[in-house]
Regions:
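Non-catalytic, polymerase-adjacent accessory regions of viral genome-replication enzymes
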Residues: 1-100, 104-111
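Duplex nucleic acid-engaging cores and interfaces of nucleic-acid transaction enzymes
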Residues: 151-159, 185, 203
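Conserved phosphate-binding loops in nucleotide/dinucleotide-binding enzymes
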Residues: 145-146, 150
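Conserved polymerase palm-domain catalytic core
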Residues: 113, 120-135, 139-140, 163, ...
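Short alpha-helical scaffolding segments that buttress acidic/His motifs in well-ordered protein cores
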Residues: 86-90, 159, 237-242
Length: 310
């Protein structure tokens, strides 16, 4: 599946960020019997075989050298089979973006459309489109802004998101539960329940980062991505989505910060950002500064640290 002279093992050493080992198990949870993840159908497994093999090679490259940057990733993004897997992984009835393109209509000429998309990605002619702004009501009566990407942006973001996820899953800490493979809100609640009911808790702090998705620094986001990725084309692709802007009622707005909720790439970018800005700090603080044991449960931008009695 790789092109000639391309290798998933293309890595260069990077300076150690002096962090704890990742790929941690879930923190503070009771053991659960059975498989909590739904098993994909045989049809889905067959379609995803090539993509999964690629992701496994990337995972092994990361494991071989945890202090290195991967320099050969972008060619996986414009692989037609990977793009096809990304297309079939989308929601068929999802609302269209600014392009007005639907899943069904795009699929009428799927092979030709994906070949054209792959060609534009390969030669650098791919352009990210602005997201379409939509609002959904929140329980407190306020409105939550969502950004709906164009269909082709969804496809490419799906492929890129899987690549980023498989890289950083080897680093993410055990108390992070949001938007990660094999993890869900119920597991976060289970960890919280165990901590409160079975531990001697002194206090519980519930923290929500205000406007988190809208205020992510693009400059720092890129710096964090570059901790593990040395492929300039891959980094540039992510920057295109960050800078694509928002279209609302016919008015285009430049994106100076943030990553839109609704984009397929946004959850993994948010987790990467919080890993470097919160998780590593919280882990260091509770190990070096806190008096007594501290358990942390984080689901996306919601966090519940708990201090246990000594």
């Amino acid at each position: 599946m790789n092109g000639p002279r391309q290798s998933d093992g293309g890595i260069v050493p990077k300076k150690s960020p002096n962090k704890p080992q990742g790929a941690e198990g879930m923190e503070g949870r009771l053991p659960v019997k059975g498989n909590e993840q739904e098993r994909p159908s045989l049809r889905t497994q067959s379609r995803d075989e090539g993509k999964q093999a690629t992701l496994e090679r990337i995972r092994e490259a990361v494991k071989r050298n945890k202090e290195a940057k991967l320099t050969s990733l972008y060619h996986h993004v414009y692989n037609v089979e990977h793009l096809k897997a990304g297309y079939f992984g989308l929601k068929k009835k999802a609302a269209p973006g600014v392009d007005g393109e639907t899943w069904a209509h795009y699929g009428e000429k799927l092979e030709a459309n994906l070949a054209d998309l792959a060609g534009r990605l390969a030669r650098g002619a791919y352009r990210a489109q602005p997201v379409r702004r939509k609002y959904i009501p929140k329980p407190d009566g306020r409105q939550r802004p969502l950004g709906i990407p164009a269909l082709e942006d969804k496809i490419v973001q799906s492929v890129a998101a899987h690549i980023l996820s498989v890289i950083w899953e080897e680093e993410f800490l055990g108390f992070s539960y949001g938007f990660r493979p094999g993890r869900n809100p119920h597991q976060a609640l289970n960890a919280l329940t165990v901590g409160i009911e079975q531990k001697r808790v002194s206090w519980v702090l519930d923290a929500d980062i205000r406007g988190f998705f809208d205020t992510i620094s693009h400059e720092w986001m890129v710096k964090f991505i570059e901790h593990r990725i040395g492929d300039r084309r891959m980094v540039a692709l992510i920057q295109k989505w960050l800078k694509a802007g928002v279209l609302e009622e016919g008015q285009w707005t430049w994106s100076e910060a943030g990553t839109p909720q609704g984009g397929l790439i946004s959850p993994v970018l948010a987790n990467i950002y919080l890993y470097y800005t919160f998780d590593l700090w919280a882990h260091h603080w509770r190990k070096q500064k806190a008096q007594g044991e501290v358990i942390v449960v984080r689901y996306a931008d919601d966090c519940v640290p708990r201090r246990l009695s000594e």
